[in-house]
Amino acid sequence: MIFSSLHYPGDYGFIPQALHADGDPLDVLVMTNEPTFAGCVIEARPLGVFRLVDKGQLDDKILAVPHTDPLFHEYHTLEDAPRHFLDEVAHFFSVYKDLESAEVVGKGWEGLEQAYAEIENAVARYQGDLKNLFV
């Protein structure tokens, strides 16, 4: 929930079975040309990761595009996304918690390899937590 009149610059959700270092599911922002609905699953491919510190903790955001949408067929890295869109996303995450008086600091974009590494680490973290439930 956002406390301000802002809206997410894409469809915002999480990557299933992927746990970020902050203990929450790994966040993802999917570039879409049409809005979807809460609870839907989108088969998406990552382009990069926006590094963010929220209330003193890392809170990375994966940027992805719908895998089967022909509009995004040629999007494979951050360099393929419009620069203005990347700037909008960075601006959004730098101000979206202003009315909560929460300190949020954008650390900038990192590329596809870093996004894949973050996703792989998050999946491993989730699997490790799952195993610990049965110990």
Language-model regions, residue ranges each:
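Hydrophobic N-terminal alpha-helices or hydrophobic patches in metabolic proteins across all domains
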Residues: 1-135
